[in-house]
Amino acid sequence: TYYAQKTHTRGKGVELANIETPLVVEEIHTEYLRAGAQAIKTNTFAANCSVYQGDTALVERILRSGWEIAARAAEPFDAYVFADIGPVTGLPPADILDEYRFLVDTFLAAGARHFLFETNSSTEGLVETAAHIKQVCPEAFVLTSFSAFPGGYTRDGFFVEELIRTVAESGYIDAVGFNCVSGVQPMKELVHLLGKCPLPLSLMPNAGHPIVIDGRTFYESAPDYFGDGLAAIVRDGVSIVGGCCGTTPEHIRALCAALADGGHMSEGASAQAER
């Protein structure tokens, strides 16, 4: 959403910008880092062969370029870089596993050691892929994030407690969390609904409620409201906080200020992630 806002583009895979306008992508990463982000995600959320119509060579170029851009931007800030992988859907189960393995192997070869699987509605392929990552690179850090409606159920009809228990019991996932679908307040209610989490918990809510103007989606939310609300959730034991759709550098700056002004990251906290 921030890329579309800055470039006034729409309807084209944003991941292609890693190849076509890499300096713009690097500039956006840098804006979030200057705002205080301690971690960034590669611009690769939908970079897979299901979305890009089986073009393996193109997807590999997007992934490698996305990693290089993010790593270059993060280096002066000593920030973490997470290889960002969205859901792989629309394929037979065996093909989904093969696609995930292709994605993570490409990232591993590029140097990735932190992985974010986000916006998931089920655990399909996730545990097996995390196991593969750990087999190849035992020191890798794997974060799995689910998208759930305020009642605690995902788009595929799974209850969040069930999903988190499954990935936690696998032993291959280092942290779990929620992202997208909801704003700060509904996500806070999800945390209370979940109760005690067996793994470090990550939250990346949307900046606010979406509105559509002239075919483009915007998220109405004051950065201070976002920052103060998310910082308050940290006191409930959340370890990693950041933002999803609609989150601008100003939202991250407000979040960092709110954390410094009274929100205390729980033990093991390591990142504020951006989108």
Question: What do the PLM-derived regions correspond to, one by one?
Answer:
Residues T1-R275:
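Domain-level signal for soluble alpha/beta catalytic cores
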